[in-house]
A protein has these predicted regions:
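Nucleotide-state-sensitive switch-loop elements of NTP-binding domains
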Residues: 14-70, 79-165, 172-179, 185-187
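Hydrophobic positions on the alpha1 helix immediately C-terminal to the Walker A/P-loop
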Residues: 75
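Canonical P-loop GTPase G-domain recognition
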Residues: 201, 207-266
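Conserved beta-strand segments of the P-loop GTPase G domain that flank and frequently precede/overlap
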Residues: 126-127, 178-181, 203-206, 244
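Long, well-ordered amphipathic alpha-helical subdomains in the mid-to-C-terminal portions
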Residues: 28-30, 244-247, 254-329
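Extreme N-terminal basic, low-complexity initiation segments
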Residues: 2-6
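Short, positively charged and aromatic/hydrophobic N-terminal segments
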Residues: 9-10
Length: 329
């Protein structure tokens, strides 16, 4: 970075950092745009900005997963409005690698969450435009840190509920919630075991009108499945809970929030909170290294030739790999 660019960089960060720290939503949006950029100078600015923000601010990070049709946008708006009305500052972020191809879930949801998006104590950010999960997850994780630095009390991290996005979200949240719609036994069989194993709370939405009886049965089915599947590893005497809400009617939202707070408080008091966040930081450190190494490997001009040598049998896979690793290190 030349002297002129460095001066502009430092000046820009000195102006942006205090605005973000004061909770300015426009400044926060600009900061997240820097994080999402693929330009090296923008990435450097973003790193400097993250380092300049106040330390020690911690939001409750809540991961929300649910496939299309469960009423996720309705739930997020109703839940978010309940929180801001209780005096909480709420940010909504997304991990959706499909957004570059399909428009993503939250891109449309932002227009439907009109009340929450207009509220001065709320901030909603669509998924970044990278089409691969690694890039989206990394940018979202950094956006979470920005939101904490901006003083938000709760960060809702939404995932579309397909692929490996749930695992990525679980590695950046304090409480992971699986949102479901009322369904029969066949649909229960279709829920992936993996997501059931990481969920801290299952919330059955749309528990109203003609669907209320079905929601009651669905909730009971999942509660039973959770008891058979696992116990909470941090507390062997308890199981993840399943509960019903109606985002349309507003029923059950307070109870769900109280359960999330209770779990977070228990983890904070037991030391699990700090250990979990430390493990997550280490996980993302390794991910940053892995993605950085992959990028450097992809930029090597001799990589294709080495791969051709391996295909043709002129070199062994181990030998060719060692050549690359020796050059890198």
């Amino acid at each position: 970075m030349d002297a002129g660019r460095r001066a502009r960089h430092e000046s820009g960060m000195s102006e942006l950092a205090p605005l973000v720290a004061d909770g300015n939503r426009r400044a926060l949006a600009r900061a997240i745009t820097l994080i999402e950029s693929g330009r090296a100078d923008h990435r450097a600015e973003a790193a400097s900005l993250l380092a300049a923000l106040p330390k020690g601010r911690e939001a409750l990070r809540i991961g929300l997963s649910g496939t299309p049709g469960v009423g996720k946008s309705t739930f997020i708006e109703a839940f978010g409005l309940m929180l801001v009305e209780a005096g909480k500052r709420v940010a909504v972020l997304a991990v959706d690698p499909s957004s570059a191809r399909t428009g993503g879930s939250i891109l449309g949801d932002k227009t439907r969450m009109e009340q929450l998006s207009r509220h001065p104590m709320a901030f909603i950010r669509p998924s970044p435009s990278q089409s691969h999960l690694g890039g989206v997850a990394r940018r979202t994780r950094e956006a979470v840190s920005l939101c904490e630095g901006a003083g938000f009390d709760v960060v809702l991290i939404e995932t579309v509920g397909v692929g490996q996005s749930e695992t990525a979200v679980a590695e950046m949240c304090d409480v992971f919630v699986l949102l479901l719609a009322p369904a029969g036994g066949d649909e229960l069989q279709g829920v992936k075991r993996g997501i059931m194993e990481i969920a801290d709370l299952i919330v059955v939405n749309k528990a109203d009108g003609d669907l209320k009886a079905t929601a009651t049965r669905t909730c009971a089915d999942y509660a039973g499945a959770l008891r058979l599947l696992r116990k909470r590893p941090q507390d062997p005497d308890t199981f993840p809970k399943a509960m019903m809400v109606s985002a349309v009617e507003g029923s059950g939202l307070v109870t769900a929030w109280e359960e999330m707070q209770e779990l977070a408080a228990w983890r904070q008091g037991s030391g699990i909170w700090d250990a979990r966040r430390a493990a997550q930081a280490a996980y993302w450190f390794r991910e940053e290294l892995r993605q950085g190494m992959e990028a450097r490997l992809a930029a090597r001009e001799d990589l294709a030739a080495l791969e051709d040598d391996v295909r043709a049998g002129r070199k062994t896979a181990a030998g060719a790999a060692q050549e690359v690793l020796s050059a890198l290190f």
